[in-house]
């Protein structure tokens, strides 16, 4: 039987050791816990891999940080994990970090690095009324990269962008067991809700937002389609893993790294266990 053990920098399960098979290690990284939505999609497709989830609760949220800070921070965190584990592949499960740091990561490391981008292309194909909503952080909405996606894949659609950092906070709160205020969601989405022809397809352009899918469907008009990048990222990851030439293997258990252990992080431990993780540790930088 497993029992919980908590130290200054570690929360873990103490259990009778089991012989785990050797398998490739995937690091999934986000500034917060929103990347768990992407991790969950990947794990459903590839359940037998070794997973590390890392989140930067010390610098969260990234939306208000400078580009240089984000690049240096993400490279530093991935480097710190790589020093402790032989990584086969890294997924940057954060839209803000992906649009900024991928070139630097791919230049620094030899393993594949997968990023997430708003699912504008599939949404443009799915819309029936030609009105697509892009729900993301303010930073993602304003990025030139996002505008390029719209220009490339959605010129035939009306794109209504809505930037909200409040939704990120609500998603984090929900994962920690807090009730979500429907009236607060209605207030955030009011620019769309008061339109005579609101979006019939909404791009969830932040990895936190799939965690709020149930509540968003309650507020948005009936039949509104929600589109995110999770499934596409999982398929891309599966293809890359299948085509790696002699990737490094691990027999370790799944674990989570944060940048500081706080009471708030400790409350996440039961949720992280349900996601299949065996320990939560502070990552020294």
From Swiss-Prot:
Pathway: Cell wall biogenesis; peptidoglycan biosynthesis. GO terms for biological process: cell wall organization; peptidoglycan biosynthetic process; regulation of cell shape. It comes from the Bacteria. It is an enzyme of class 5 (isomerase). Its EC number is 5.1.1.3. InterPro entries: Asp/Glu/hydantoin_racemase (IPR015942), Asp/Glu_race (IPR001920), Asp/Glu_racemase_AS_1 (IPR018187), Asp/Glu_racemase_AS_2 (IPR033134), Glu_race (IPR004391). Pfam families: Asp_Glu_race. Substrate binds at residues 30-31, 62-63, 95-96, 207-208. Coiled coil: none annotated. The active site is at residues 94, 206. Keywords: Cell shape, Cell wall biogenesis/degradation, Isomerase, Peptidoglycan synthesis. The keyword Ribosomal protein does not apply. GO terms for molecular function: glutamate racemase activity. Gene3D superfamilies: 3.40.50.1860. It catalyses: L-glutamate = D-glutamate. Provides the (R)-glutamate required for cell wall biosynthesis. Belongs to the aspartate/glutamate racemases family. This is Glutamate racemase. It comes from Pectobacterium atrosepticum (strain SCRI 1043 / ATCC BAA-672) (Erwinia carotovora subsp. atroseptica).
């Amino acid at each position: 039987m497993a029992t919980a053990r908590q130290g200054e920098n570690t929360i873990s399960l103490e259990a009778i050791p089991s012989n785990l098979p050797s398998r490739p290690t995937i690091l999934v990284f986000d500034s917060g816990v929103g990347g768990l939505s992407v991790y969950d999609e990947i794990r459903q497709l590839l359940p037998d891999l070794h997973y590390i989830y890392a989140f930067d609760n010390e610098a969260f949220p990234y939306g208000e940080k400078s580009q240089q800070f984000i690049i240096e921070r993400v490279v530093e965190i991935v480097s710190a994990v790589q020093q402790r584990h032989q990584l086969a592949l890294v997924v940057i499960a954060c839209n803000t970090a992906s649009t900024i740091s991928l070139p630097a990561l791919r230049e620094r490391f030899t393993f594949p690095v997968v990023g997430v981008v708003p699912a504008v292309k599939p949404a443009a194909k799915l819309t029936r009324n030609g009105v697509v909503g892009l729900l993301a952080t303010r930073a993602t909405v304003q990025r030139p990269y996002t505008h390029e996606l719209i220009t490339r894949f959605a010129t035939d659609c009306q794109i209504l962008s809505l930037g909200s950092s409040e939704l990120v906070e609500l998603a984090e709160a929900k994962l920690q067991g807090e009730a979500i205020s429907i009236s607060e969601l209605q207030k955030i989405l009011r620019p769309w809700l008061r339109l005579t022809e609101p979006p019939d397809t909404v791009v969830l352009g932040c990895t936190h937002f799939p965690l709020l899918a149930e509540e968003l469907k309650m507020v948005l008009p009936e039949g509104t389609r929600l589109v995110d990048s999770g499934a596409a990222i999982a398929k891309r990851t599966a293809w890359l893993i299948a085509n790696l030439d002699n990737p490094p293997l691990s027999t370790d258990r799944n674990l989570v790294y944060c940048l500081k252990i706080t009471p708030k992080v400790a409350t996440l431990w039961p949720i992280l266990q349900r996601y299949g993780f065996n320990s939560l540790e502070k990552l020294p930088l």
